[in-house]
Curated annotation (Swiss-Prot):
Belongs to the bacterial ribosomal protein bL20 family. NCBIfam families: rplT_bact. GO terms for biological process: ribosomal large subunit assembly; translation. Pfam families: Ribosomal_L20 (PF00453). It comes from Thermosipho melanesiensis (strain DSM 12029 / CIP 104789 / BI429). It comes from the Bacteria. Binds directly to 23S ribosomal RNA and is necessary for the in vitro assembly process of the 50S ribosomal subunit. It is not involved in the protein synthesizing functions of that subunit. One of its GO terms (cellular component) is ribosome. GO terms for molecular function: rRNA binding; structural constituent of ribosome. This is Large ribosomal subunit protein bL20. Keywords: Ribonucleoprotein, Ribosomal protein, RNA-binding, rRNA-binding.
Length: 118
């Protein structure tokens, strides 16, 4: 008995070819190359999602550090002071305050200074 799977095979190929529409050259026309390009693109997308988290954290830390140094405190001293005083604010929110609301950020810096005795 022969295997009849034309519908599913066509559906699978169509899905790949639709996904690689817009790729350059043979990558958008030839199935074998298109499949390889699709797999590689998905791999890069996965890695990119992981890198994005790291990049944003780095950006937040840089922003906090710059704002803290303007107030006479280093980044690590600020974070340590906030931890001692029991303030649980994440780096994203702290960076947001540093950029958009410097007065509130200054209050956090003062709390951290008091906690570490500076």
């Amino acid at each position: 008995m022969r295997v009849k799977n034309a519908v599913n095979a066509k559906k699978k190929r169509k899905k790949i070819m639709k996904a690689v529409k817009g790729y350059r050259g043979a990558l958008s026309r030839r199935y074998r190359l298109a499949k390889q390009a699709y797999i590689k693109a998905k791999k890069h997308a996965y890695v990119g999602r992981k890198l994005k988290k790291r990049d944003y954290r780095k950006l937040w830390i840089t922003r906090i550090n710059i704002a803290a140094r303007n107030e006479g405190l280093k980044y690590n001293e600020l974070i340590h002071g906030l931890k001692i005083s029991g303030i649980n604010i994440n780096r994203k929110m702290l960076a947001e305050l540093a950029v958009n609301d410097p007065e509130s950020f200054k209050e956090y810096v003062n709390i951290a200074k008091q906690a570490i005795g500076k």
